[in-house]
Amino acid sequence: MPQSVLKATSEDLKKMKSAYAHHLTDTLPPGALFQAKVPGCTITAYRSGKVLFQGQKAEAEASQFSHLKATDPKSSKTPAVTKYSPPSGIASMSVIGSDEVGTGDYFGPITVCAAYVDASHLALMKELGVKDSKGLKDPQIINIAKDLIKTIPFSLLVLRNEKYNAMQEKGMSQGKMKALLHNQVITSALEKLDGKQPEAILIDQFAEPGIYFKHLAGKKIIRERTYFSTKAEGIHLSVAAASIIARYAFLIEMDKLSEAAGFEIPKGAGPHVDKAAAKLIKLHGEEALRQFTKLHFANTQKAKKWL
């Protein structure tokens, strides 16, 4: 049975329990804090902080909480160093970094960016304010991104909701979509370097390398000097720059959706999003969800309970 495991803080667990308030079960497994069942997935949260998603839609359901750290359910040991682990000294190298935004948001697209930062531009990146985007507010993201897109080579793709939903309904997992998008922006960014080769390619890890490359079977891929790491924004500024540009693009798309909806479209996937989706249905009909949301998220059914 497909499954995903996340590690959550006590505060995260409270928010998750609230998000699944309408789907909680009456009986609990030993050690469980709560259990919820939604179509295609059973979610079990343990007092240890482990949250287990099981079922055909486990990956999709877990992706709503992409800010949480994925973990191997069989081991809590430090991950082994592999050939795909970033080399020591990568922080001072010339690198193409890639990252994505929007995978855990019910509304809005997925935006993926690959950005090249030459070693000679690392100091400039710091001057521009480039750092882990999680520590930046939206106005800062916008200002920094406007400088970045005029300064460094990058490639950006936006997977809007209608196409996302069509791909998902044909059986493609979000993980495969992300792999295809990352590969495409990396390839495109390389082409913009006019033959110059980066010292490394660093991908903000969302899947094990073997799974990532399996998703890309039959595609043109670059394996040489390609590395994966979680929290890669803190490892090289190219990933931080890519994340900032991707988030900037996401904000632009969300503004467009808000204008089309006639009210502000919220980020995230919590209860406030359910209410906004219900409002969208009332104003524009249920079919409007296809252009605004990731339909397979549990929020779709939760929104209907507000009607």
UniProtKB/Swiss-Prot annotation:
Q: Which GO terms describe its biological process?
A: DNA replication, removal of RNA primer; mismatch repair
- Entry-linked CDD domains: RNase_HII_bacteria_HIII_like, RNAse_HIII_N
Report the main location listed first in the record.
Answer: cytoplasm
Query: GO CC annotation: what is one?
Result: ribonuclease H2 complex
Subcellular localization(s) per the UniProt record: Cytoplasm
* Cofactor details (free text): Manganese or magnesium. Binds 1 divalent metal ion per monomer in the absence of substrate. May bind a second metal ion after substrate binding.
Tell me where in this chain the RNase H type-2 domain is found. 93-307
Q: Does the keyword rRNA-binding apply?
A: no
Residues reported to bind a divalent metal cation: D99, E100, D204
- State the Gene Ontology terms under molecular function: magnesium ion binding; RNA binding; RNA-DNA hybrid ribonuclease activity
Superkingdom of origin: Bacteria
Coiled-coil spans are none
Catalytic activity annotation: Endonucleolytic cleavage to 5'-phosphomonoester
Which UniProt keyword terms apply here? Cytoplasm, Endonuclease, Hydrolase, Magnesium, Metal-binding, Nuclease
User: What Gene3D superfamilies does the entry give?
Assistant: Ribonuclease H-like superfamily/Ribonuclease H, TATA-Binding Protein
* InterPro entries for this protein: RNase_HII/HIII (IPR001352), RNase_HII/HIII_dom (IPR024567), RNase_HIII (IPR004641), RNase_HIII_N (IPR024568), RNaseH-like_sf (IPR012337), RNaseH_sf (IPR036397), TBP_dom_sf (IPR012295)
What does the record give as cofactor? Mn(2+); Mg(2+)
Under Enzyme Commission nomenclature, its number is 3.1.26.4
By its UniProt entry, which HAMAP family does this protein fall under?
RNase_HIII
Summarizing the function annotation, the protein's role is: Endonuclease that specifically degrades the RNA of RNA-DNA hybrids.
Cross-referenced NCBIfam families: rnhC
The entry sums up its family as follows:
Belongs to the RNase HII family. RnhC subfamily.
The entry's protein name is Ribonuclease HIII
**Species, as recorded:** Bacillus pumilus (strain SAFR-032)
Q: Which gene encodes it?
A: rnhC
